[in-house]
Amino acid sequence: MARELLSLAYPITMSSPDHHCSGHGGQHAFGFMNPRLRDGVVVHSRRSVLKTSLAGLGGLTLPALTKLRAEGKTAKSGKSVILLWMTGGPSQIDTWDPKPGRPREIRGPFKTIPTKLPGTHICEYLPKQAAMLDKFTLIRSVDCRFSNHEPNMVMQTANLANEPRTNPKAKYYPSFGSIVAKHHGSNHPSMPPYVVLNMKSRSHVGWGGYLGTQYDPFDGNNASKLFQLPAGLSMERLQARQTLSQQMDGLRAEIDASGMMSAMDSFSQTAFDIVAGGRAQEAFDLSREPQKVRDRYGDHDWAKQALLARRLVERGSSFVTIDLSNHGASGTWDNHGDNIPPYGGIWNGLRPLLPVFDHVITTLISDLGERGLLDDTLVICMGEFGRTPTLGTQGSTDGRNHWPYVMSMCLAGGGFRHGQVIGASDKDGGQINERPVTPGDLAATIYHHMGVPLDTTYTDHQGRPNFIVDQGAPIRELI
């Protein structure tokens, strides 16, 4: 009987579950587990059996699947976060903190427009946001010193030591999304908790780090392929394989004395729930959205990703990051100057982005509100840092360099108090003038929203506990 059961778990080749490593692309599926022997038959764990059973699903292996949920945990609340990551670092002066009274080399080429908040002006290329700014909070005093274009940036981890150029441990600091995945989990057992969309480079998003690769984000770029059943594998056959794995329970109880199998049960059920349940597959399928809704968002890639993010949180994902970039490397918003391709300067580089962003963010907020999702969904728009208060850096006449001393960002939703501006920069937009907001404050606000206790810790490679928020508190003006 054992031989018959195991003969159905056909051998395959698959990628290593630790995608930070290389050189294991041809590892046998059963090689991940230590076998036990019974009557001369090699008997593998239930996890191995299900791994082989599901491995034909367009590359949707069990290691990939088990990254989608947090220890089998499903959150009791429906809270979620959508992070629109403006990769490269948008200019504060040319977006949400204009300086119209200053010389052109400071104020830049754009005009300003009034908003729904009396006395508050923003860039002329954000008219839709200006008209509904009462739904947003602008923060004009974010202190993002130490941040740079690197994996697990300071602004996605809230760890001020997160500078890989000087700190080799920086890549291990877990991101907001990974911590939410571990300590909040998904809002539905068949949905991944932490998803990244439109990822142009690994350096644009935050990873699991010390938490482990199981808390890395699920790459939504590949979702359409991952959830396709290959020819010859029907849902009935997949369900039969699930029954097979359950039949293996009795056998493995006799031969596995390590206790590992009990822990693996949740991995197996997670994999089957996500594939066979159909909920995740349906969530990633934009063709199921009414045409009028798709038309409302539009055909731009960022708009499609925003619609997809709404579908994901609506169906149970708890943290979705959209990489708002058209490029790899440092990112689309890295507007150093027209003579520094491919990003351009403020006029030729930033200006075309703003109307697209304006449409995407306002459509998303309106749609979430109309569906009753906005109070449970915190939407955050930000990049790594601000940009220099003076035009003409690095030999250009129309670009701005990195400037971590002050940054602007915006938030909406989450049941917080909006229709306000928090903090202020100085007259040139180069320094914080009042109410500094730190990455730790932002992290504490996210975890407060998601119900993750601020005294939660994770363990580093030396076995030492580290607080998820070392310095910071929820932004009081929002609460």
Could you describe each region identified by the protein language model?
Residues 2-479:
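Ligand-binding pockets and gating/stacking loops
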